[in-house]
């Protein structure tokens, strides 16, 4: 049995964090293409601090209004990074919504979107007490809500009707759901509709990212406005 929780509160069991856009799909693609790990950071300053620690294998990815951040290797783009050999790379993503969707102390966490849905439901089905949390909770992203409904339908087809499953009925086509979402519209306005097509593909990434660690950045030590965290994800094979 699994349930969708729209609140940002500690999960009592294994947590499935669901995000499609803007960063979740890219993270699973990076690991599927051989990246050793993928870090999720709240902003460019923490990302740059982390890159200094990780060294030459760091791959900095982030953007503002569709343009790469200064000194970064690229944008959060499925299209631009597809097919690259990332073996040994240590990706660092600036993804504030995804970063803020996890609470300190949560340990058993899996990241799922449409692209790795098939691998996810095969690996997650044996686990008990799954909680699905759409990214952005307690104000979840529309695309994440629809993906959570899709995943719940596969993992627990007889679960009671939820808002996520109701949205899935309203948007049975994943690509249409992404296009109608605010996060999808932002990409559309930048002329990046191909990103929506790639993010809506189901089951093309054979990996499920699992949380493998959290790096703490105290504000007093690094000159930040508040304490920050960066989460490290690695491929999980069950």
Predicted feature locations:
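Short acidic, Gly/Ser-rich segments with clustered Asp/Glu that frequently serve as metal-coordination loops
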Residues: 10-29
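Short beta-strand segments
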Residues: 17-18, 61-63, 93-95, 133-135
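A short alpha/beta connector and helix-capping loop motif
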Residues: 24-45, 54-55, 64
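Class I SAM-dependent methyltransferase SAM-binding "motif I" and its flanking Rossmann-like core
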Residues: 116
